Amino acid sequence: MIYIVIISILLLILFFIFVYLYDNFNIVLKNNESIKNKKEIPFIISVKNYDDNLIDIINKTNISGIIINIDNLDIENLDKIIKKIKRKIKRKILIAIDQDYKNTYNLYYDKKFKVFSSYIGERKSEEYAYKIASERALKLKSVGINMILSPICNTYCSEKSHLKEHIFSDDKILASNLIYQTVKAYKDSGLITAVKYFPKYYNDELYIDENIENIESIIDNRETFLAGIKANTDIIVMSHIKDNYKYRDFLFNNMKFKGIIMTDYINNDKNIINYAVNVLSSNYYKDINKLKNIIENNIKETDTVLCSKLLKLIKKL
């Protein structure tokens, strides 16, 4: 009788050991499978229209998300589109709106009164900045948006630039305070936040000379980006620049940023970088096979730390 009890206990122990090893093996297997099968890959695409091709792109390429840049869009249609997307895909993805895309910036407000960042800057009120960002976030969240490319942290642009209305102020201290409150409001409301444009948006061209040695000297108002980092922004959007590794290292090492770097819209394959979430322009939307080839050709070089950060971010959705 004692032997039977002992044997039963041993078998029970072996059973629990087996279950533990099996579960952990599956976790490892699934993690490896995610990399091998590209279940979470650092590519996002700009969406200019909704159709079945979009669903195929999301499901067949396993991109991590979309930025909705559809023209003539209102909040009701946005709600319907996102519901259709969620019904037809079986995984979490980033669904974003871009602050300075003119056709979607103000779709969740009275079109007769556009609350641009420049207006908030004129009010010089941190409480007002937080209030407006909270209202935006709650409205966007209610229709299924989970990420916003905002705010713009730069304090300078060309007078003719479309960014002019989206910049809080040329006063670095004021801009930093408003940026902090805006990011905090988005985060408090549960939106993933991507601030931009690092290191600068210059003269309507996202270009910086590769021969400049002193990185600090050309960073446009670094303290405004530090305000975004202090408010725990998830992502920083980096301009298309040569020698971009210097700026990546400066963000992580000097500015102590621990989040994710994301590119601006990519129109040329040469601008794809392995340490960032690559945002492909809507041009890539036309050919799903070309898109798959681009991802397959670049995924092997993708930074594993980036993949890990991105996976954690998407799991929170």
What role is predicted for each listed range?
Residues S46-D51, I215-G228, N244-Y245:
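A general structural motif
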Residues I132, R136, L178, N221-T224, ...:
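Alpha-helical packing segments of well-folded alpha/beta enzyme cores
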Residues L149-I152, T193-N203, A231-H240:
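Core alpha/beta catalytic barrel or barrel-like domain that forms the active/cofactor pocket
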